[in-house]
Amino acid sequence: MAQLRKPSQSLVLSESVDPTTVDPFVSVRTEEVVPAGCITLWEYRDSCGDVPGPLSHGDLRRLRTPDGVCKCQVHFELPTVLKSGSTGTVPEHPAVLAAFIGRPRRCSLEQRTKELDSRFLQLVHGGLPARPSYMIARPPRPVRGLCSSRNGSLAQFGQGYCYLSAIVDSARWRVARTTGWCVRVADYLRLLQWVGRRSFGSFQIEKSAVDHVYHVVVDAEYQSEQDGALFYQAILGLAEKDPLARIGGRLNPLAAEFAPGSALRVEPVTPQVTRRKGSTRMTGRDPTIVSVGKVGMAITSIQDALVATELRNVNFGRRDTEAECRRLWARYEVNDYFRRHKAELLKFDARLRSRMAKKPASSRARPSDAKIQCIGWRDRHLLPQRLAGLSKQGRSLVWSRFATSNIRRKTPPCVVNPSADPVVHNWKDSAALAVKKIAEARRRQEIRAAAYAERAKARGQTNVVASISEAIETTLRRNKTRFALDGLHLAASAIVTTRLRSWNQEEIRAGREFRKSTTSWIWRHVPSSIQDALNLTSVRDKLDPGRAFGYVQAAVAQGMSDFRRAKRALAIVAKPVIRNIRDPYEHGFVKRDGKLRHSRDAFNKKLRTKAVAATKVHKIKF
C-alpha cells in the first residue's frame, strides 16, 4: 500500500518562518512513508515519526504534502446539521454511510467545503480586518460569507477545543476544521481579530500539566461588552510571556468523547411541552429504532448503526424492500392525507363507486396485464384477431388452412361433409395413427410458432414467445423484476388517485397542508429532526429511480398509468408506527389490520362491515 523511501524535507514544511516556532517535523524518522491513495493528515504525520503537537494554521499554509493527503483537521460534519436533534439518534451521516457501504472515505467533507476552508485560512493569514471582530457585534464583512449558517455549540466539540468559546459560534465549525484541537498563540490572535466574540463571559487561563499548553475556562454568567477586548489583551500578554504557548487542553484518548459509541452523539435537546405529549418528561436517551428485516433494532451509537446495517445488508431481499416501501409510503403520504381529508374522500369514493356500479361489467373489471401470447396447440383459440398484422400471404405461410379458418370463422374451401348416408362410413383412424397425426401436427405447429415468434421479436414485439416453457420462463423472469416494487405502486397510485379526486374541493382550502402530501414534498422537505432525516433518507432512496436497489427502474416510473388500480387500495392504509393518545381533531384512526375505522361507540358497531365503513361518513359528537 505504501512504499518507504528516503525523506525529502521539501515535502514536509518548506521553511520555518521564525526560529521561535518549533518545527513539528524536527525528529522525522529516517524513512518516511509515501501514501498510496488518500490518507488523512494525521496518518501522514504519524508515518513521519513522532511529531510533537498538532499542526496549526501557519503549518497548514506552509505544509507541502504529497497528493492525496487531506488537510482537514476534522474529517466529518457532526449531525448538528439538523437544528434540533431528537435525543441520541445517529443520522445517516456521510462518514457512517461510507463506513458501512464498505468504502470508507477518509474525509467525508464535500469538495466545496474544503475550498471554503482554504479560503478562510488564506484570509485569516493574509491581513487584518479594519476593526477587529472582538470589538463589533458580528464578524467583519470579508469573513461573514465564510461563516456557516449553522452554529456549533461547545458541547459538540470534545476536549482540546476550549479555545472555541471565545470565537463566534457561526465560525466554530470552520475554525475547528482548519485549526485542529490545540491552537498556537500567534494563530489564535489572528483568529480573535477575524472571528472573535465580543461578549462571552468571564474567563480564566490556566496552565496545564504539560509545558506550553494552556486551558481556557469560561464562566458565561457575567457577560459584558468588553469580554473580547480583555481576552485579546490577556492572550497577547501570554504570547509575549510564552511564544510557544498552545491553547486547548491535552487530549486524553480514553475520554468519553473518543468511545466510538458516543463519537457522533448529538447533544440532548431541551424538551418542549407539546399538545401531543402534554407534559415535559425527559426520558433520557431514546434509541432510534431501525427495522432490520422483520426485526426492530435499537440504535444508540454509530457502532449499532454499523451492525444494524450489516444485518440489513445480509437479509435485505426483495420482500423486505417491498414491505419497507409499502410501510414508508403509507407512513409518509397516505396517512397524512387521510387524516386531513377523510370525510371528503369517503364521500367522494362513495360517489365514484355508485357511478361505477351503473357501468357494464367490462368497464368495471380491473384492467389486467397483457397476456403473453403462447401459440400452443391447445390454445389456438387464444390467438389474436389479426395475427399481429401479418399480410394474408404471411399468414397463410404460418397457419394451416384449418387454423386460419378456425380463427376467421369462415367456411373452409375444401371440407368433406360427413355424408348423411349411413352407408358411406367415415372410418375413424386407429388410436396409434391418431397419436401419430397429432404428434406430427404439433411438431409442425411448433415450428410455425417458433418462426412466427422469431419474426415478431425481430419486429420488436415483446410479449410473443415460441413455446409454453418459454412463456413460463419469461413470466417468472418478468415477475421477478416487475412486481418487486408492487407495494410501492399501490401506495403511489392510491396517492395519485386521492389527489386527483379531491383536487378541486381541497386544494383551495387546504393550502400548504395539501401540498405537504404530494410526492415532491418528500424531495423539498427539510427534516426537522434527525429521525425525520433518517426516514426521509430511506424514503428517498426507495423513490429515486436511479437508486432503486437493482430493480427495474422503469417500474418506478409507471405511476400515473397505474392509478386505476387504486380503487380498493384507498381504504387500506398501513398501520402507523406510533400510536398517539387520541387527538380530538383527527377523524378516526387506523386499526391493527390497516382498515380505517370511524368511531368506537356501540351505536356504530353494527355498521362496521367493509362496504358500509368505506361509504358511510359518521358524524362525530363532541
Swiss-Prot record:
The record marks 248-249 as: Cleavage. Changing residue 233 to K: No effect on autocatalytic cleavage of p29. Reduces autocatalytic cleavage of p29. One of its GO terms (molecular function) is cysteine-type endopeptidase activity. Its EC number is 3.4.22.-. Residues 1-248 form the Peptidase C7 domain. GO terms for biological process: proteolysis; symbiont-mediated suppression of host innate immune response. Keywords: Host-virus interaction, Hydrolase, Inhibition of host innate immune response by virus, Protease, Suppressor of RNA silencing, Thiol protease, Viral immunoevasion. Residues 25-73 are annotated as: Involved in colony morphology alteration. The active site is at residues 162, 215. Pfam families: Peptidase_C7. Changing residue 212 to S: Reduces autocatalytic cleavage of p29. InterPro entries: Peptidase_C7_dom. Changing residue 70 to G: Alters colony morphology, with extremely reduced growth. Complete loss of ability to enhance viral dsRNA replication and virus transmission. P40 protein is involved in reduction of conidiation of the host. Not necessary for replication. Also involved in reduction of orange pigmentation of the host. Hypoviruses induce hypovirulence in their fungal host Cryphonectria parasitica. The consequence is attenuation of the related fungal disease, chestnut blight, that causes cankers that enlarge and kill branches and trunks. The virus-like genetic elements consist of cytoplasmically replicating double-stranded RNA. This is Polyprotein p69.
